[in-house]
Curated annotation (Swiss-Prot):
Single Gene Ontology BP annotation: pyridoxine biosynthetic process
Taxonomic lineage of the native organism: Bacteria, Pseudomonadati, Pseudomonadota, Betaproteobacteria, Burkholderiales
Gene Ontology molecular function: O-phospho-L-serine:2-oxoglutarate aminotransferase activity; pyridoxal phosphate binding
Organism this protein belongs to: Burkholderia ambifaria (strain MC40-6)
Places the protein is found: Cytoplasm
Residues annotated to bind pyridoxal 5'-phosphate: W101, T152, D172, Q195, N237, T238
Cofactor-binding details, from the entry: Binds 1 pyridoxal phosphate per subunit.
Name of the featured protein: Phosphoserine aminotransferase
Major localization listed first in the record, in broad terms: cytoplasm
Gene: serC
Length: 360
């Protein structure tokens, strides 16, 4: 029996994608091979690779000024790869810290330069807000400004993206990419691990403006130098072929759903249902300012936290899995990515109401 999986990542995949992958496991399109067995330079895999790149460009409306790269190492590796590729002769990059992941990015950048904390969304209740542009204290000549536009752990999503003029804006979009349309032209770099909305763990997507490809530090490994990766069409070293294949299936699924405008409407409906339930309750609490509440990752706390384990056990009995909050913040977290259906959120809300009534 399939359950409703609210994992923050690796996360739920569309059932259509899983079934197609299962059907093609032993024989992809009459090739007699699994995608896992293909040469990454053979015509079979190259057709998968090129289709995935093209479909992602179409879905996000990526302009010709930007290259799409498939790398490895996830978002955490990009915390090092970004400064190694962008600092160049400059030593300073600015960071707007809105949660645990942008804090990790800030800390990692200290190994390669002098990161500057331009603004922080931390409050007495933790990370609960996204500082407005007027609050940012940018340095004089930063190599770039870094944001995490959706904080997976803290549930803070930044929707308003300012124009920074000539300063490249770098965004970690790991946990909301493909959940809504984005104006890619506003960004110098977008990066994200695949294991939330793109597909399975193993491939990292980087979208980088072409004019930023010549800024790498000399210490940057060749396999992580964006210019080298771009020049080799993301095939400089053996890529994560099966992860790219799964991502390609997800891209095709998204197109069948009507693209990002349609998926955004679905995500808004799911998030509203869950937040409305939390806010109407005297038993559940979300601490994030409403204007920046994440549509993808919804943390919430029980009024009586001694009942956390009972809540999780009851949820599991109903087929509602992976609801435990991150260890750094506690409580609960429902990750409601693209592949989580509205029916799953309705089932969760029904259970939350039942659990609250039993404890009243």
């Amino acid at each position: 029996m399939r359950v409703f999986n609210f994992s923050a990542g690796p996360a739920a995949l569309p059932e259509e994608v899983l079934r197609q992958a299962a059907d093609e496991m032993l024989d992809w399109h009459g090739s007699g091979m699994s995608v896992m067995e293909m040469s990454h330079r053979g015509k079979e895999f190259m057709s998968i690779h090129e289709a995935a790149l093209a479909d992602l460009r179409e879905l996000l409306d990526v302009p010709a000024s930007h290259r799409i790269l498939f790398l490895q190492g996830g978002g955490i590796a990009e915390n090092a790869i970004v400064p190694m590729n962008l600092l160049g002769s400059r030593k300073t990059a600015d960071f707007v810290v809105t949660g645990s992941w942008s804090q990790k990015s800030f800390n990692e950048a200290k190994k390669y330069g002098t990161p500057h904390l331009a603004a922080s969304g931390k409050t007495a209740d933790g990370f609960t807000r996204a500082p407005a542009r007027a609050e940012w204290q940018l340095s004089d000549d930063p190599a770039y400004v870094h944001l995490c536009t959706n904080e997976t752990i803290d549930g803070v999503e930044t929707f308003e993206i300012p124009d920074l003029g000539d300063v490249p804006l770098v965004a970690d979009v790991s946990s909301h990419i493909l959940s809504r349309p984005m104006d890619v032209a506003k960004y110098g770099v977008l990066f994200g691990g695949a294991q939330k909305n793109i597909g399975m763990a193993g491939v990292t997507v980087v979208i980088v403006r072409e004019d930023l490809l010549d800024r790498a530090l000399s210490i940057c490994p060749s396999a992580f130098e964006w210019k080298t990766v771009a020049a080799n069409n993301s095939l400089y070293n053996t890529p994560p072929t099966y992860a790219i294949y799964i991502a390609g299936l997800v891209f095709q699924w998204l197109k069948r759903q009507g693209g990002l405008e349609a998926i955004e409407a679905r995500n808004i409906e799911k998030a509203k249902l869950l937040y409305d339930t939390i806010d109407a309750s005297g038993f559940y609490l979300n601490k994030v300012e409403p204007a920046v509440r994440s549509r993808m990752n919804v943390p919430f706390f029980l009024a009586d936290e001694t009942r956390n384990e009972d809540f999780l056990a009851g949820a599991k009995a109903r087929g509602l899995l992976q609801l435990k909050g991150h260890k750094s913040v506690g409580g609960m977290r429902a990750s409601i990515y693209n592949a989580v259906p509205l029916e799953g959120v309705k089932a969760l809300v029904e259970y939350m109401k039942d659990f609250e009534q039993r404890g009243a």
